[in-house]
Swiss-Prot record:
Transmembrane domains' residue ranges: 12-32
Outcome after substituting residue 80 to A: Increases accumulation of full-length MifM. Reduces misCB/yqjG induction in misCA/spoIIIJ mutant
Effect on the protein upon substituting residue 71 to A: Reduces misCB/yqjG induction in misCA/spoIIIJ mutant
Keywords: Cell membrane, Membrane, Transmembrane, Transmembrane helix
Keyword Transcription carried by entry: no
Name of this chain's protein: Membrane protein insertion and folding monitor
Superkingdom, natural source: Bacteria
Cellular compartment(s): Cell membrane
Outcome following mutation: residue 81 to A: Increases accumulation of full-length MifM. Reduces misCB/yqjG induction in misCA/spoIIIJ mutant
Membrane topology classification: Single-pass membrane protein
A GO CC term attached to the entry: plasma membrane
Crucial for elongation arrest: region residues: 86-89
Function per UniProt: Sensor protein that up-regulates translation of the secondary membrane protein insertase (MisCB/YqjG) when activity of the primary membrane protein insertase (MisCA/SpoIIIJ) is limited. Acts as a ribosome-nascent chain complex. When the primary membrane protein insertase activity or level is reduced, the membrane insertion of MifM is impaired, which induces arrest of MifM translation and unfolding of the mRNA hairpin. Unfolding leads to translation of the downstream gene, which encodes the secondary membrane protein insertase MisCB/YqjG.
Length: 95
């Protein structure tokens, strides 16, 4: 019985790791990348090639979108793990 409980705890830890911890670490990493991108924009010379500027903006926008999706995912996982309110539909919490 003890081995069964330990294996369930291990499985629950892996579920929490892949649904909360790993996305949170990814979001933190993306936040650091965004900070570096924005700091780099301040020091850019005004003679940058137009293509490089567009590529840089697209990369920054992509990081912002990914960061937003990950933080939204984490919020939904937390809401799914908490008791559902009567006003809230459980189906709206699913991705």
């Amino acid at each position: 019985m003890t081995m069964f409980v330990e294996s369930i705890n291990d499985v629950l830890f892996l579920v929490d790791f892949f649904t909360i911890i790993l996305p949170a670490l990814t979001a933190i990493g993306i936040a650091f990348l965004l900070r570096e991108c924005r700091a780099g924009e301040q020091w850019k010379s005004k003679r940058t090639d137009e293509h490089q500027t567009v590529f840089h903006i697209n990369r920054t926008d992509f990081l912002i979108i990914i960061y937003h999706r990950i933080t939204t995912w984490i919020r939904k996982v937390f809401r799914m793990n908490s008791p559902v309110n009567d006003e809230e539909d459980a189906g709206s919490l699913l991705l």
